């Protein structure tokens, strides 16, 4: 279902839901059975797998890959520019990958150029500055290893 108040510019499967006030740019790739909640922006160079939930208020910038069965909590902040400036002719797009089954808690900030491993969990409000290995729980500002899950 595509809510009539969303700006859907990409082709997505019928099994995926996009709620009101979302903007999805034309080259974004979104898989089956996803749920994109209200007030989300998904740019062009974005790949989203199957069975992904993206809660309200998330912007998924160019260079972000989200694999299958990932949960992205409300108001998660992705980044794709290590040294942001209003105008930077030397800008380099940094890629971020969220691997299968990972869960990103509400209000997290993920700095660019990192990988969140398979089935990893990031606690709400954490700031992730480096790669998180598969099957680990990380929490805090900056996020640190808590335990294996």
Where are these regions (language model features)?
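Extracellular disulfide-bonded cysteine-rich modules/repeats
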Residues: 135-137
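Flexible, glycine/small-residue-enriched loop-and-beta-strand segment within the central core
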Residues: 1-7, 12, 18-115, 141-142, ...
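Conserved G/P- and acidic residue-centered "switch" motifs that form tight phosphate/ATP-binding loops
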Residues: 122, 140
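C-terminal intrinsically disordered extensions
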Residues: 129-130, 144
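Short hydrophobic beta-strand segments in globular cytosolic domains
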Residues: 105, 111, 123, 128-129
């Amino acid at each position: 279902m595509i809510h009539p108040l969303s700006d859907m510019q990409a082709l997505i499967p019928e099994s995926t839901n996009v709620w009101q006030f979302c903007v999805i740019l034309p080259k974004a790739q979104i898989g089956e059975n996803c749920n994109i909640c209200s007030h989300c922006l998904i740019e062009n160079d974005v790949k989203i797998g199957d069975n992904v939930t993206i809660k309200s208020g998330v912007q998924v910038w160019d260079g972000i890959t989200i694999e299958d069965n990932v949960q992205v909590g409300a108001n998660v902040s992705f980044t794709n520019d290590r040294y942001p400036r209003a105008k930077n002719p030397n800008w380099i797009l940094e890629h971020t990958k969220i691997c299968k089954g990972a869960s990103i808690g509400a209000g997290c900030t993920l700095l660019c150029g990192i990988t969140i491993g398979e089935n990893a969990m990031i606690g709400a409000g954490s700031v992730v500055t480096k790669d998180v290995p598969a099957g680990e729980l990380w929490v805090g500002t900056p996020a640190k290893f808590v335990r294996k899950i």
